[in-house]
Every structure is written in C-alpha cells, then in structure tokens.
Amino acid sequence: MTRKQKRLAVIAGGMGFIATAVLLVLFAFSQSVAYFYMPGDLAKSPIGAGTLIRLGGLVGEGSIVRGEGTQVQFSVTDGSDAIKVRYNGILPDLFREGQGVVTEGKFEPGSDVFVADSVLAKHDERYMPKQVADRLKADGVWKGEEASQ
C-alpha cells in the first residue's frame, strides 16, 4: 500500500466510525424522546398505543376518582377535549382539579385510556409552558391573569 492509499483508508475508516456513532446517538434519542401533546391534538390525530408521549393540560373538574392504594383516575382537558388518565403512584402535593398537569406515559392498547408513568403538577400558571398557555388562552380557559390578582 502506498502512503496515499494508507491515508485514504484511515480517512474512510474514521468517516465510517463517525457515521456509526451518529446513527447510534440518533437511534438512542428516538427511543427516549417523548413528544408533548394536548387533548385537542390527540383528538385531531390519535397516537398509537405504546408510543411514549407527554400529555398536558388541566385536571378536569370532578374527574378525580381514587382507587385502591395509590391508584387514581382523572381526566386531562384543554377546555375542548378531555382524555382519561390512569396513574398508579403517589401524586404531587399540588395535584388538584383545575390545576395544570403534565403526565408522561402511553395509551393502553385497545382503549382510549392514557396510562401515566409520571405526573407533574404545575405550581402556577406563570410556570406553564408557552405552548400550553397559548392553547388555553385560545380556548378561553386561561386563568393566569386572574390567578395573580
């Protein structure tokens, strides 16, 4: 092998290694990324069972039903649409009806029930993501300005 051929082989091997590393990183991210949806988004274009997502909105008024132990069922709404959520675990102290919430989990196969792995309660509307706040304002359910007065 000439010097030029060796250099070309090293460059080609390095490029192959970098391409493999990039593909592995992209694959790892695609397996762990959870996209954010609101109930209205899922009403327009449903997500298949088993897909990890984040579901956000407000806890529906009168929707909290406690089961045995730490089981709880409630609905998440954006003012126009609502999705039933089932969670088995300890809820955050700030979790209550009408409060902002973000849940992460998957839809139950053959059902329209969202099974949450984690539940995050929003402390205050001031800390709500802009996309959620904009949607709630558009739907007329925003309580941010009144809550601070």
From Swiss-Prot:
Residues that, per the record, bind heme: H123, Y127
Cell membrane is among the record's keywords: yes
Periplasmic side: 29-149
Membrane topology classification: Single-pass type II membrane protein
Location(s), subcellular: Cell inner membrane
Gene3D superfamilies: Nucleic acid-binding proteins
Residue numbers on the Cytoplasmic membrane side: 1-7
InterPro entries for the chain: CcmE, CcmE-like_sf, NA-bd_OB-fold
Main localization category: membrane
GO biological process, one term: cytochrome complex assembly
Domain of life: Bacteria
UniProtKB keywords: Cell inner membrane, Cell membrane, Cytochrome c-type biogenesis, Heme, Iron, Membrane, Metal-binding, Signal-anchor, Transmembrane, Transmembrane helix
Molecular functions per Gene Ontology: heme binding; metal ion binding
Segments crossing the lipid bilayer: 8-28
GO CC annotation, single: plasma membrane
Family according to the record: Belongs to the CcmE/CycJ family.
Annotated HAMAP family: CcmE (MF_01959)
PANTHER family given in the database record: CYTOCHROME C-TYPE BIOGENESIS PROTEIN CCME HOMOLOG, MITOCHONDRIAL
Known function: Heme chaperone required for the biogenesis of c-type cytochromes. Transiently binds heme delivered by CcmC and transfers the heme to apo-cytochromes in a process facilitated by CcmF and CcmH.
Protein name per Swiss-Prot or TrEMBL: Cytochrome c-type biogenesis protein CcmE
Species, as recorded: Rhizobium rhizogenes (strain K84 / ATCC BAA-868)
Taxonomy of the source species: Bacteria, Pseudomonadati, Pseudomonadota, Alphaproteobacteria, Hyphomicrobiales
